[in-house]
């Protein structure tokens, strides 16, 4: 399922990142790597605040829709 469908407070794992090479590289540099455990902290003004490797990262809904996740 896309990250945009994950519930706030849920812990999930990154499964696949879709998009162009530069998009995938950008998200990987933020810590979104296959198998990484992440959690949705909150949604503010259409952006998702995600906990990735003990760091909070804000991503747009458009960018989050490219990140496929699976349940923890």
Sequence positions of predicted segments:
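C-terminal structural segments of small proteins and small subunits
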Residues: 3, 11-12, 41-72
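Short alpha-helix capping/helix-loop boundary micro-motifs
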Residues: 22-26
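Short, conserved catalytic or interaction motifs in soluble domains
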Residues: 19
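Hydrophobic beta-sheet segments that form the core/acyl-binding groove
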Residues: 38
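Charged, well-structured alpha/beta interaction segments
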Residues: 29-30, 42
């Amino acid at each position: 399922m896309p990250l945009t469908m994950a519930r706030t407070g849920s812990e999930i794992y990154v499964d696949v990142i879709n998009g162009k090479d530069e998009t995938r590289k950008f998200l990987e540099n933020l810590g979104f790597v296959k198998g990484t455990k992440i959690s949705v902290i909150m949604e503010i003004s259409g952006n998702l605040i995600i906990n990735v490797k003990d760091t909070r990262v804000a991503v747009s809904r458009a960018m989050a829709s490219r990140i496929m996740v699976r349940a923890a």
